[in-house]
């Protein structure tokens, strides 16, 4: 059994990507809607929530767990050793994919307030390409729009203008899988963190019956 957690729809996007790769995976998905959004929480609160979420998924039999949330992934190094066991963050793998995708090494990051403030994507990108130019924009209102089924057009346009001259955009919140095609229509490469996470998790899947348990709070 594998597990996935997020505060909302972003985790559902990751689960959908996992199903494309491994329809036989037995999975449990926890959506912590009670504490959504994670992107505005303090670091201390986020550590507590992430460790609790991991514990919940393990209680349902999950051995390998995807943090399907870039914001929660920023505090992965702060989790206890026991809570890090078998847990997959998505910042570094997403940054690596962006560096590989970018031709001019000018990379934009669309993310939540806490993720941008942490500088996690910038650090990870430069670990893979020290000369990369990185622009980051916090688009918290875009998270709300996607979570509540609202229009994303204006937020996407404003965010892309703020990012400037780039050729690759990291969708640095798994919710932003919803705007991947809009980014591509602007002639930019879009790196989908939900898909990257699902690919990482799929490598740990043991063949099962394809059941999914949904936990909501």
Report the location of each language-model feature.
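Non-catalytic structural scaffold of enzyme domains
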Residues: 1-217
């Amino acid at each position: 059994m594998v597990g996935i957690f997020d505060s909302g729809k972003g985790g559902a996007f990751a689960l959908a990507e996992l199903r494309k790769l491994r329809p036989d995976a037995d999975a449990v998905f926890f959506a912590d809607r009670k504490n959504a959004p994670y992107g505005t929480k303090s670091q201390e609160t986020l550590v507590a929530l992430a460790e609790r979420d991991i514990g919940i998924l393990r209680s349902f039999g999950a051995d390998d767990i995807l943090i399907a949330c870039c914001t929660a992934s920023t505090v992965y190094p702060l989790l206890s050793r026991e809570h890090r066991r078998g847990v997959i963050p998505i910042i570094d793998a997403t940054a690596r994919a962006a560096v590989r995708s970018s031709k001019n090494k000018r990379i934009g990051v669309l993310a939540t307030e806490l993720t941008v403030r942490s500088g996690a994507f910038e650090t990870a990108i430069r670990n893979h390409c020290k000369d990369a130019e990185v622009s980051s924009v916090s688009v918290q209102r875009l998270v709300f729009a996607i979570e509540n089924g609202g229009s994303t057009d204006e937020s996407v346009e404003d965010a892309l203008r703020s990012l400037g001259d780039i050729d690759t955009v990291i969708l640095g919140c798994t919710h932003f899988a919803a705007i991947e095609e809009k980014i591509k229509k602007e002639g930019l490469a879009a790196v989908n963190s939900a898909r990257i996470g699902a690919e990482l998790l799929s490598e740990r899947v043991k063949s099962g019956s394809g059941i999914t348990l949904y936990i909501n709070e």
